[in-house]
Amino acid sequence: MGKNYVDIERDNGETLRYRKHVNGRGLIAHGAKVHASALIEAGAYVEPGAQVAAGARVLRGAWIESNAAIGPEAVIEEHAHIGEGAVVGSGARIGVRATVGDRARVAVGAKIRDDEIVGDGQIVATDKRGLRLAA
């Protein structure tokens, strides 16, 4: 039986310990809070201080930065990037390779399309098709 954690050294020399999540085997940093029912696929990372709620899905290669919050039943598609302090609302879907900037807010049920960028600090709501709504 192999070890259930991985140590990764940052550029500044600091070492972070990541444990493998029971549901999907993705890597969860010490200090992150991930609900047991959330799916964190292998190859996905959740950084310290981040929170992932019940039923959320973080797929292969996705990266959730420090202090970000992922709401219940939200889906973060493959290779998407959620910036530091960003919030993704309940039931929202972030597309493949999409980027949500630092401190950005994605509304409940919003759909961010593949390769789309939500800038730092932006607040985004969409209709069911993923078209952005006026603020």
Residue ranges: model-predicted function:
Residues 2-27, 72-135:
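Glycine-rich hexapeptide-repeat left-handed beta-helix
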Residues 1-67:
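Extended, small-residue-rich solenoid/repeat segments and analogous flexible loops
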